[in-house]
Amino acid sequence: AAILKSKADTLNKEQFSALHYTAPGTDLTLGLPKNHVWESAGAINAQGESFLPNMPTEEVFTAPDFRRAEGYVTSTKPLSYNGNIIEGIKVTFESGEIVDITAEKGDQVMKDLVFKNKGARALGECALVPDPSPISQSGITFFNTLFDENASNHLAIGAAYATSVEGGAEFTEEELEAAGLNRSDVHVDFMIGSSQMDIDGIREDRSEEHTS
């Protein structure tokens, strides 16, 4: 948990303007909101005590600016959603919006998810997971997102967490949307990471730094 917190702290200091993901089948640029917050596993309860709500955990995560996604991304692991196993997902974005989504298996399920749910044509989370992570090294697909998301970098279709921007927990729905946080009734993670993926942070001055 300390290593993850250190990674989150470093990213929070950087305040990258965007992230650029490249890998076979992926070339995606995601804008990040101003004053975005990278979070790690640790949480603090009402008594001020630290605890880990998710075990195991390997991720640091924030929300992308839902209005700023350009390019395409391909999944690297199966997704279990609503009793369906979905494989080979490819998503194409223009101006933040999903304009096309296909899957080698479960194609219609993904199309229905994206095009029939409010706010599901945009992203609500981007999470960085080291490769290899202990879950990925196990070689096991658990078909349970809380486990499988710790195997690789992932994105989430749908709602962003309010805490992904400074002060967001106190924001109204309208203020969250104005800050770039997607509002939706769904939140579905899908895994995109691999040993072949590179992620570069892009600063406001367009300079870049390798992040993962």
What is the role of each PLM region?
Residues 100-169:
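Dual-mode signal for accessory low-complexity, basic/Gly-rich regions
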Residues 68-70, 86-88, 95-98, 121-125, ...:
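Active-site lining segments that contact anionic ligands and/or coordinate catalytic metals
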Residues 209-211:
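Conserved small/polar residues in nucleotide/adenosyl-binding loops
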Residues 62-118:
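Long, well-ordered mid-to-C-terminal structural blocks that present hydrophobic/aromatic surfaces
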Residues 139-207:
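Internal helix-turn-beta structural module
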Residues 26, 35-37, 78-80, 97-98, ...:
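Short, glycine-/Ser/Thr-/acidic-enriched flexible segments
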Residues 1-70:
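Active-site bordering "gate/hinge" segments
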